[in-house]
Amino acid sequence: MEDYNKMAHAVGSGFHMNPSPGNIKDGLITDAIKSAGACKKGGTAPVVDVLDYTEPATKAGLSLVCTPGNDVEATTGKAASGATLILFTTGLGTPTGNPVCPVIKIATNTKLANKMSDIIDINTGDIIDGIKTIEQMGEEILEYCIVAASGEVIPKAVQLQQDDFIPWKRGVSL
């Protein structure tokens, strides 16, 4: 964050539009909260490495990739770093995929999952709705990843040919 902030200020920009209005509406009022939430989505496994954009993962375990906030630039960077599946959580319904790596879209709420069922693979709103525990949902996500990786199920972004690909140009991208 510090390096990115310096880069933004060097070209006369900053984080005044980040988090986005949609993020703020949903409670992500600072970059720190947004970043902490992104890290938490990795679960309880220890972070073994923090990678620069497109830097190849070389260690077994959970690595974080420093990407811009733009969804397509972020998924492109993760695929370039070696991701073989991208689990993309969304509370607003970003319709994105990747031509190199299957993107599994995970809705954070049931309203979104129902409204955009054509692009959502997994609804984690069942946790908030009291239908499933975090552990049960984790098992469901793991099972989906296994069948998607084996080709038994094709994620909706792949079915819909949502082949979005935008490399980050190393400028300021919020």
Question: What does each of the following model-derived ranges do?
Answer:
Residues 1-174:
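Anaerobic metallocofactor- and corrinoid-dependent redox/one-carbon enzyme cores
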